[in-house]
């Protein structure tokens, strides 16, 4: 039985993906289940986080968002029994890759998959659903009538975040990085209040948002990265991102800025402006649910909520055509370079 692993060279950030033979080990741990994988979504691997958590190995398992059928359960498993259909996110320290036919996983990382949800949809939406719920429910207290700016709304995560915000009755503004993205966002229903096309670099995001909100500013901002310096000092890949000053300018009083920029630096004038607005800055790190067991029950509730919303049609994920396992190596190389737009799912 083959599984996909990655190997990182010691000299640079280059990652190599390799298939390796893996033993089909029976369940020996009391709280573990053995799952036959039906689908596994591909996501970017945060090698920096793995290094910081001292989780580096010679060969690290690849693929964490999985859906499948329970084959066997440990003695103390209470949530599942054989033949149950399940979905979940494997922990960072999982010994088994999700890109493998059979895996072992602790029962507390899985929830039941609704019957009418397909394997690929379940695996493809689970991570972005957790990210969206974390950003909008736990970090920014989304409620009906609030205005939300979701940067890069045509990405797989952005699409799910927009759908969740609309479901809660919020007014959504989003940015598009290309003509295709703009057309995709304009086709979404319910419709977005304003799509800001930033592809040509001429449109000012802050001005557009203030105009849309009557000068009051937006209540919640979920960024997709920000520029910390002037355009001359930033790499080309960051040129389409808004400057941190733009985000602070467009935030309303009591607003929430949810950022994915782990190296965010705020100068005293920035902090003073946020203080005057009574605004907050929160960091979106969805791995925190798996890095600590302190809120395991809340995490399982989020997983169930994501599946219920997928089943009810609230979430309509942006998925690419499913691919077979033998194509996973090439696809992961593309995903690792952040070159994909739609979510790629491997179907078994």
UniProtKB/Swiss-Prot annotation:
Transmembrane segments annotated in the record for this chain: none
UniProt-annotated location(s): Early endosome
CDD domains with a match to the protein in the record: enoyl_red
Gene3D superfamilies registered for this protein in UniProt: Medium-chain alcohol dehydrogenases, catalytic domain
Oxidoreductase as UniProt keyword: yes
One Pfam family in the UniProt entry: ADH_N
UniProt keyword annotation of Oxidoreductase present: yes
One cellular component term from this protein's GO annotations in UniProt: early endosome
Enzyme class: oxidoreductase
Keywords annotated in UniProt: Endosome, NADP, Oxidoreductase
Assembly with partners or alone: Component of the FERRY complex composed of five subunits, TBCK, PPP1R21, FERRY3, CRYZL1 and GATD1 with a ratio of 1:2:1:2:4, respectively.
Record protein name field: Quinone oxidoreductase-like protein 1
Species of origin: Mus musculus
């Amino acid at each position: 039985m083959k599984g996909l692993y990655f190997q990182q060279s010691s000299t640079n950030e280059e990652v190599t993906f390799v298939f390796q033979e893996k033993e089909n080990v029976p369940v020996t741990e009391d709280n573990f289940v053995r799952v036959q994988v039906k689908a596994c979504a591909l996501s970017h691997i945060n090698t920096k986080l793995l290094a910081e958590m001292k989780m580096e190995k010679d060969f690290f398992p690849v693929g964490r968002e999985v859906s499948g059928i329970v084959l066997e359960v440990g003695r103390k498993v209470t949530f599942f029994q054989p033949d149950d259909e399940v979905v979940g996110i494997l922990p960072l320290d999982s010994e088994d890759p999700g890109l493998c036919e059979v895996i072992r996983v602790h029962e507390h990382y899985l929830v039941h998959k609704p019957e009418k949800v397909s394997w690929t949809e379940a695996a493809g939406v689970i991570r972005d659903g957790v990210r969206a719920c974390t950003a909008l429910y736990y970090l920014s207290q989304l409620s009906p009538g609030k205005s939300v700016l979701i940067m890069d709304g045509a990405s797989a995560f952005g699409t799910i975040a927009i759908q969740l915000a609309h479901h809660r009755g919020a007014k959504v503004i989003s940015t598009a990085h290309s003509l295709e993205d703009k057309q995709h966002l304009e086709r979404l229903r319910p419709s977005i209040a304003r799509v800001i096309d930033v592809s040509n670099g001429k449109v000012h995001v802050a001005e557009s948002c203030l105009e849309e909100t009557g000068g009051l500013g937006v209540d919640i901002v979920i960024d997709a990265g920000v520029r910390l310096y002037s355009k001359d000092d930033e790499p080309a890949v960051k040129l389409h991102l808004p400057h941190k000053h733009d985000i602070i300018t467009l935030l309303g009083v009591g607003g929430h800025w949810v950022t994915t920029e782990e190296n965010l630096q705020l100068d005293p004038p920035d902090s003073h402006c946020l203080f005057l607005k009574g605004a907050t800055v929160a960091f979106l790190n969805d791995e925190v649910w798996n890095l600590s067991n302190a809120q395991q029950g809340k995490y399982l509730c989020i997983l169930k909520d994501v599946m219920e919303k997928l089943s009810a049609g609230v979430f309509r994920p942006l998925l690419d055509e499913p691919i077979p396992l033998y194509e996973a190596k090439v696809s992961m190389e593309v995903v690792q370079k952040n070159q994909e737009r739609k979510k790629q799912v491997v179907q078994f």
